[in-house]
């Protein structure tokens, strides 16, 4: 009630044409309004906003695609935090990374990579985000995606090697204790290098991976060799 005792009129929120509350917030670049939808129990969109976070529009774009196209970095991070699927693709195989790459939105690309978006996702033309960036001459994006791929390749090699070593069905009887220690220590060393080297270049990651493979691959090759059958005891004569 107002001081005069009259009921205060409720302000009616009008969304932009052909939008949901989510895409409305993206187009208006109003991150606070989006947060309010999720966190304010009295908000009129509180019960429906989660269903809209990945809903594609008539143009086939998800909210994250729209944010990526417009270069909305903070909005993209908020969408991801609220459940936007960074792996989501449209019927032609385009994901948010393709849109960010096409429009040269480097900040959004970084946010998507941090959220572990798939660098290898291809559209119907066989293009990853990197190739899309290259086609539109977005050099900074190409360089960043090369850097990100080199880093991910190194980390993935470390991870798969560690998983292989932890699988007794694969390594039992094939690797010596020394072999296992070499793998464990070398993987740990490279993982720690990634963690502490904040200014690593694309070439640095490639060089580190090659050095790791040089040590690890000869040992892992033993896993492809046939196991020697234990010799059976000789039978006694009758």
Predicted region positions:
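Ankyrin repeat boundary/linker residues
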Residues: 15, 56-57, 90, 123
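Acidic, negatively charged sequence tracts
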Residues: 2-25, 91, 147-238
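Conserved ankyrin/ankyrin-like repeat signature
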Residues: 33, 75, 107-108, 140-141
């Amino acid at each position: 009630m107002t001081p005069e005792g009259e009921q205060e009129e409720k302000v009616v929120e009008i969304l932009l044409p052909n939008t949901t509350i989510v895409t409305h917030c993206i187009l208006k670049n109003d991150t606070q309004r989006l947060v309010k939808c999720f966190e304010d129990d009295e908000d009129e969109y509180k019960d429906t906003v989660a269903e809209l976070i990945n809903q594609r529009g008539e143009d086939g774009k998800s909210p994250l695609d729209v944010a990526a196209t417009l270069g909305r970095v903070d909005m993209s991070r908020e969408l991801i935090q609220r459940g936007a699927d960074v792996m989501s693709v449209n019927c032609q195989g385009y994901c948010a990374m393709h849109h960010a790459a096409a429009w040269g939105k480097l900040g959004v690309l970084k946010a998507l990579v941090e959220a572990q978006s798939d660098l290898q996702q291809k559209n119907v033309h066989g293009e990853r985000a990197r190739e899309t960036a290259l086609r539109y001459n977005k050099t900074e994006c190409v360089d960043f995606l090369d850097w990100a791929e080199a880093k991910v390749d190194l980390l993935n090699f470390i991870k798969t090697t560690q998983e292989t070593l932890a699988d007794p069905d694969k390594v039992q009887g094939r690797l010596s204790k020394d072999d296992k220690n070499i793998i464990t220590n070398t993987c740990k060393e490279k993982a720690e290098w990634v963690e502490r080297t904040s200014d690593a270049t694309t070439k640095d990651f490639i060089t580190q991976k090659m050095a790791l493979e040089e040590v690890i691959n000869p040992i892992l090759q033993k896993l492809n060799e046939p196991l020697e059958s234990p010799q059976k005891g000789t039978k006694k004569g009758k």
